[in-house]
Amino acid sequence: MSQERLLKVLKAPHISEKATNNAEKSNTIVFKVALDANKVEITNAVEQLFEVKVDSVRTVVVKGKTKRRGAKIGRRSDWKKAYVTLQEGQSLDFVEGAAE
């Protein structure tokens, strides 16, 4: 897989209360990923970009919400979320550098 595709697969870490609890309890990191990305691409991207070993990947497509602004009705885009479980002894911390 090309370096360009690796960078396009992972869009951002998804930070939420549920994601934080998963990270602490089951060593699972949550990412926003490209809609067309598959589990193999997500695994390769995480392993190569962050130099950690991935145990499993679960994905879900989050449906966009319908929003109104006055009489106009629109819809937000669908997006894909990936739950990446790291192997025992592996860790990935996004908040550590921000504390300084």
Curated annotation (Swiss-Prot):
Top-rank taxon:
Bacteria
Instruction: Alphabetically list the UniProt keywords.
Output: Ribonucleoprotein, Ribosomal protein, RNA-binding, rRNA-binding
Which cellular components does GO assign to this protein?
Answer: ribonucleoprotein complex; ribosome
Q: Does the keyword Hydrolase apply?
A: no
InterPro entries, from UniProt? Nucleotide-bd_a/b_plait_sf (IPR012677), Ribosomal_uL23-like (IPR013025), Ribosomal_uL23/eL15/eS24_sf (IPR012678), Ribosomal_uL23_CS (IPR001014)
Q: Which Gene Ontology molecular function entries are recorded, alphabetically? A: rRNA binding; structural constituent of ribosome
Q: Which GO terms describe its biological process?
A: translation
> One Pfam family from the UniProt entry?
Ribosomal_L23
Matching Gene3D superfamilies: 3.30.70.330
| Quaternary structure and interacting proteins, as annotated | Part of the 50S ribosomal subunit. Contacts protein L29, and trigger factor when it is bound to the ribosome.
Question: Which NCBIfam families does the record cross-reference, listed alphabetically?
Answer: PRK05738.1-1, PRK05738.1-3, PRK05738.2-4, PRK05738.3-2
| Family stated for the protein in its record | Belongs to the universal ribosomal protein uL23 family.
- Task of the protein: One of the early assembly proteins it binds 23S rRNA. One of the proteins that surrounds the polypeptide exit tunnel on the outside of the ribosome. Forms the main docking site for trigger factor binding to the ribosome.
Q: What is this protein called?
A: Large ribosomal subunit protein uL23
Its gene is rplW
